[in-house]
From Swiss-Prot:
The active site is at 235 (proton acceptor). Residues 587-605 have a biased composition (Basic and acidic residues). It comes from Lodderomyces elongisporus (strain ATCC 11503 / CBS 2605 / JCM 1781 / NBRC 1676 / NRRL YB-4239). Glycans are attached at residues 148, 657, 736, 763, 803, 875, 921. Zn(2+) 1 binds at residues 189, 201, 261. The keyword Protease applies. This is Vacuolar membrane protease. Binds 2 Zn(2+) ions per subunit. The lineage of its organism: Eukaryota, Fungi, Dikarya, Ascomycota, Saccharomycotina. It comes from the Eukaryota. One of its GO terms (molecular function) is metalloexopeptidase activity. The record marks 332 as: Transition state stabilizer. Keywords: Glycoprotein, Hydrolase, Membrane, Metal-binding, Metalloprotease, Protease, Transmembrane, Transmembrane helix, Vacuole, Zinc. Residues 1-57, 423-432, 498-502, 557-635, 690-696 are cytoplasmic. PANTHER family: METALLOPEPTIDASE M28 FAMILY MEMBER (PTHR12147), VACUOLAR MEMBRANE PROTEASE (PTHR12147:SF58).
Length: 960
């Protein structure tokens, strides 16, 4: 009994000793493993690198935030005039100071053609030119008031309109050393519209030209080639000053031109257009180039309805550039285009770039000779852009060749790689996965574009006029949020595998861009390649996605087989590059902490993982050079794409967003542009959309909600972004009734007009009649008659007399001479309403009138000005310099076959544009009190522009 107990106790002790020994061994092994893990623990730099560039939600979200911040900042720096440096050289400082003073004098008052202010500006420029060229014997000037300053031409073909114009351009010629070299024209216009002080349009251009003239006169050194400066008049209503220059003897001296213009109010002067690549490439020689051929494409496609003198010079066979201010358009042609709204930096940007361009070309002895060596290349339209004062340009044919190469090479390379990886089962993509991304995008676009955008439009129709970027940010956030939700849903229901998403999206995006590039390339191959000259961004976007696709497919193709990349149950799916899941976690915990936790909890699984097939290990080692490929693909595709899309979208929106006030068609275009820009901004992020962390999702929700609230409460018009209304006071010659007409989009003018004192006091009803394209004409009878001619009755503002006639038999050619007297009016129009009039004469007398059959077709001059067109002339516009002289007109006309009487009936319409006060018997009157009233009593969110070439129009019906 005792022995048995002793043996049992000994066994227990031995077992306890064994357990203690085993525990000690396990403890030693644990310590060894812990020490081994500590030795294998990556360095701090490695851990930071893995934390930042590992495919984690937080890393990706930080990348997205950094990308947006960087792109917006770079775009602001690139487009803002604030980053233009003032000159530091004393001579340039003096040039700027003198030019700024000149601009202040020019912009002292409104100065439309035919006004006293216009005459004052003309006289100032004449004196200033004479001052600047004193002592420079190689510089001469000409006042275009000579025997040949008057002419007639066809100004419109539909309907047929003939214009008569008297020019008083101021011209300067800087004689070049080499008369064989083609000369350069520098042009701007010194007139304004009646409602504007003309600072940006086009005082900046005029002041810049004076600065350049100042520079050359101080140099006392002749340039190699001749430079002609055209300070022209009456650009605003027909580009007439530029047209007049084409008839001046100095026109034959020049072949190239630089036109200075302004369609905004300040900012930076952008290269709008270039006639060809051969001249555009010389813009790289300016110090702060700012350019985009997007605007050139807009002009070529008729999206920009206003024109500049560039059009006249190009049609006259010249080659050159159009340099202009383009924003903000709110102040364009309004009283806000004044000195207060611009800056010396804006002036210096135009002046310095113009000076650099002209100075370089004037010294270049080869310029003009090289242009003829490769005419087919150099005369093609140019594609151009700038970034941070670097200028890039290429011809459309060169871009066409590059695009053809891109369209061919990448599809072959990526297509072969894609075919290889799929057929060898290295990368398996199901049909549902392949269509899931396009389906998700289409569903997202439908939800956002047709529900969100349309609801915004119904709540705040004109908000894009003042807040285009608010709408872009809101729509983009909602798009990205909805798309991400749809992707998560697809992944949840196993429609698409997460490991397929990124590369699959990149491949499909590259295909979408390929289709767009094919369309662009087809357009570049035609004769109208300028209509696609702003689509160069598509080439870049396709290249970025194609390169990323190539790298991703290479990563898959280097693996032996897709099955070797399967991992143990319970592990995360590896990246496309095969890197272990611990460096590609979807959660936001520290990688190394989680790694240690896994070793303690799943040691067996870790050992199992390390002993996986040699093929898998070899595949990992093979593609290890592609580690963290998500970050490489992101950096290739996203930042540059986002910047190009955002910056291009910003430029276009800033240029056209105000046009939705001008027509329903323009409104549709602006809204389409808004969602196109928003969708385009989302496209580069599609491959990574499912990896945004919860904080990024909250930010998107916040932007979407806040933006939607702002859309509902923010006013579309304010002081900085006013509603632009157009004014015209009409006088009916039948009853001499005066009425004010205001033109605007439907529903915008009535509330403003109802608050005018004259309307409230008279209880006049405002009548609005619908016009084409969403516009309306709101009018009311005004008690504030114009006082342009104090002491005159309204019925005497126009006098039309028939000074003689030479009637022939019925259906023969009739001849009538009439005299039109409209004091202080320098512009009248005759509206015939049909094609009865076959020839018009300005300045003729009945006695010297030649027979109709002896008149040559078109324009001719023989003491008088003749224009003949047997197909019929519908309108005749007349412009004269002397406001007190009359228009002497002769008409050759045929009665209609159904006319019962041999009578010609037409309307004479004369315009007055001068707002200068007038006096009678020591009493001062406002010339146009009705216009002063609308300016004074309108809300601060309203600005006023002219509707026609004058602010007052008097119409009288005439029978001869």
């Amino acid at each position: 009994m005792a022995d048995n107990n002793s043996s049992s106790g000994s066994l227990v002790i031995d077992e306890q000793d064994y357990d203690v020994h085993e525990a000690g061994q396990q403890g030693q092994q644990g310590q060894q493993k812990h020490q081994q893990r500590q030795q294998e623990r990556p360095s701090l730099i490695t851990r930071v690198f893995r934390s930042v560039f590992g495919y984690r939600k937080t890393s990706l979200s930080l990348f997205v935030v950094a990308t947006i911040a960087l792109c917006v900042s770079l775009s602001y720096i690139d487009n803002s005039v604030d980053f233009i440096s003032f000159p530091t050289v004393e001579s340039e400082v003096n040039l700027l100071n003198a030019a700024w003073l000149d601009l202040q004098v020019i912009a002292k008052e409104q100065h439309p053609y035919g006004s006293i202010g216009n005459d004052r500006v003309h006289d100032f420029l004449e004196r200033r030119i004479q001052e600047l060229i004193t002592g420079a014997n190689f510089i001469t000037w000409d006042n275009d008031i000579n025997g040949n300053n008057s002419f007639m031409f066809e100004s419109s073909s539909n309907p047929k309109t003939v214009s008569y114009y008297e020019s008083n351009n101021l011209l300067v010629k800087i004689e070049g050393k080499n008369a064989k070299l083609p000369g350069i024209l520098l042009s701007s216009h010194f007139d304004s519209v009646p409602t504007s002080y003309g600072v940006t349009d086009d005082g900046m251009g005029v002041a810049s030209m004076l600065g350049i003239l100042n520079y050359f006169s101080q140099q006392k050194k002749q340039p190699e080639r001749t430079i002609v400066m055209n300070f022209n008049n009456n650009e605003e209503f027909g580009l007439l000053g530029a047209t007049a220059f084409t008839r001046h003897p100095w026109f034959k001296l020049v072949k190239y031109f630089l036109n200075l213009e302004g369609t905004g109010a300040g900012g930076k002067a952008i290269l709008f257009r270039a006639t060809d690549y051969g001249i555009a490439k010389y813009f790289q020689n300016v110090r702060t180039p700012y350019a985009s051929s997007i605007f050139q494409q807009g002009f070529a496609n008729g999206l920009v309805h206003s024109e500049t003198d560039y059009k006249v010079y190009k049609e006259a066979g010249m080659r050159g550039l159009d340099l202009a201010f383009f924003k903000p358009r709110d102040y364009y042609h309004t009283a806000e285009d004044n000195i207060r709204r611009t800056s010396e930096k804006s002036l210096w940007h135009m002046l310095s770039n113009s000076l650099d361009f002209i100075d370089y070309l004037s010294k270049d002895k080869e310029f003009g000779m090289n242009l003829e060596e490769k005419p087919n290349l150099l005369e093609e339209p140019a594609v151009f852009a700038s970034f941070l004062n670097y200028f890039f340009t290429i011809s459309t044919s060169q871009l066409f060749k590059i695009n053809v190469a891109l369209l061919t090479v990448f599809p072959i390379l990526n297509g072969l790689l894609l075919l290889y990886t799929i057929r060898s089962r290295k990368w398996q993509v199901s049909f549902s996965s392949a269509i899931s991304i396009p389906v998700a995008l289409l569903v997202t676009m439908f939800i956002v574009v047709y529900l969100v955008v349309e609801s915004y439009k119904s709540f705040n129709q004109y908000l894009p006029s003042s807040r285009p970027l608010l709408l872009v940010a809101t729509i983009t956030s909602i798009l990205l949020l909805v798309f991400s939700i749809i992707l998560v849903a697809f992944s949840f229901f196993s429609i698409i595998a997460e490991e397929n998403l990124r590369l699959l999206a990149i491949v499909e995006l590259s295909f979408a861009y390929w289709v767009g590039l094919a369309f662009t390339t087809h357009g570049l191959s035609g004769a109208e390649s300028a209509r696609h000259s702003g689509e160069f961004a598509v080439s870049i976007l396709f290249t970025l996605e194609a390169v990323a696709s190539f790298l991703g497919l290479i990563g898959w193709s280097l693996c032996r087989n897709r099955s070797h990349l399967q991992v143990a149950e319970g592990e995360s799916v590896p990246l496309l590059n095969g890197i272990d899941a611990r460096y590609s976690s979807d959660n936001d915990h520290d990688h190394e902490h989680r790694h240690g936790h896994e070793d303690n909890e799943h040691g067996e699984a870790h050992v199992q993982q390390q002993s996986q097939s040699r093929h898998k290990k070899q595949c990992k080692e093979t593609v290890h050079s592609f580690g963290y490929d998500w970050s490489l693909q992101y950096l290739i595709t996203v930042p540059l794409s986002i910047f190009i899309i955002y910056n291009s979208g910003w430029l276009v929106l800033e240029g056209v967003n105000k046009t939705l006030q001008e027509s329903a068609k323009a409104e549709t275009f602006v809204y389409n542009l808004l969602w196109i820009v928003s969708v385009s901004l989302v496209l580069p992020l599609i491959p990574f959309a499912g990896k945004l962390n919860r904080y990024m999702v909250f930010v998107l929700i916040a932007i979407g909600v806040l933006g939607t609230l702002l859309v509902h409460v923010v006013q579309p018009f304010n002081e900085a972004n006013p509603l632009k209304l157009r004014f015209l006071q009409r006088i009916d010659g039948k009853n001499n009734a005066s009425s004010v007409h205001v033109y605007a989009r439907k529903g915008l003018a009535t509330e403003v007009l109802e608050q005018l004192p004259s309307v409230r006091q008279s209880n006049e009803t405002i009548h609005c009649s619908q016009l084409a394209d969403g516009m309306e004409d709101c009018s009311f009878v005004s008690a504030l008659a114009p006082q342009i001619l104090p002491g005159y009755e309204l019925g005497n503002y126009i006098e039309v007399t028939n000074n003689g006639s030479a009637p022939s038999q019925l259906f023969g050619v009739n001849y009538n001479q009439i005299k039109i007297v409209a004091l202080k009016s320098q512009s009248c129009s005759l509206h015939f309403g049909d094609s009865k009039v076959k020839a018009v004469v300005v300045g003729s007398s009945l006695e010297s009138a030649p027979a109709f059959k002896h008149l040559p077709s078109g324009y001719s001059f023989n003491k008088d000005h003749f224009y003949k067109d047997t197909s019929g002339i519908w309108n005749l516009t007349l412009n004269k310099l002397d406001s007190h002289s009359s228009f002497d007109i002769s008409l050759y006309w045929l009665p209609g076959i159904d006319d019962e009487a041999n009578t010609l009936q037409f309307d004479v319409e004369c315009f007055w544009a001068d707002l200068s006060p007038v006096a009678l018997n020591n009493t001062v009157f406002e010339a146009i009190p009705a216009f002063n009233e609308v300016q004074q009593y309108s809300p601060i969110s309203v600005s006023w522009a002219n509707r026609e070439k004058g602010l007052v129009a008097y119409t009288k019906q005439v029978h001869v």
